[in-house]
UniProtKB/Swiss-Prot annotation:
Subcellular localization: Secreted
UniProt note: domains: A long coiled coil structure formed by 3 polypeptide chains connects the central nodule to the C-terminal domains (distal nodules). The long C-terminal ends of the alpha chains fold back, contributing a fourth strand to the coiled coil structure.
Record PTM: Conversion of fibrinogen to fibrin is triggered by thrombin, which cleaves fibrinopeptides A and B from alpha and beta chains, and thus exposes the N-terminal polymerization sites responsible for the formation of the soft clot. The soft clot is converted into the hard clot by factor XIIIA which catalyzes the epsilon-(gamma-glutamyl)lysine cross-linking between gamma chains (stronger) and between alpha chains (weaker) of different monomers.
Keyword Coiled coil assigned: yes
Protein name stated in the entry: Fibrinogen alpha chain
Keywords: Adaptive immunity, Blood coagulation, Coiled coil, Disulfide bond, Hemostasis, Immunity, Innate immunity, Secreted
Oligomer status and interactors: Heterohexamer; disulfide linked. Contains 2 sets of 3 non-identical chains (alpha, beta and gamma). The 2 heterotrimers are in head to head conformation with the N-termini in a small central domain.
Protein purpose: Cleaved by the protease thrombin to yield monomers which, together with fibrinogen beta (FGB) and fibrinogen gamma (FGG), polymerize to form an insoluble fibrin matrix. Fibrin has a major function in hemostasis as one of the primary components of blood clots. In addition, functions during the early stages of wound repair to stabilize the lesion and guide cell migration during re-epithelialization. Was originally thought to be essential for platelet aggregation, based on in vitro studies using anticoagulated blood.
Domain of life assignment: Eukaryota
Cellular component terms (Gene Ontology): extracellular region
The species this protein was found in: Ceratotherium simum (White rhinoceros)
GO biological process: adaptive immune response; blood coagulation; innate immune response
Length: 16
């Protein structure tokens, strides 16, 4: 699950 920059990625458990 990729979101916009700075958003929290629930499935990834981090930020992109």
């Amino acid at each position: 699950t990729e979101t916009t920059e700075g958003d929290f990625i629930a499935e990834g458990g981090g930020v992109r």
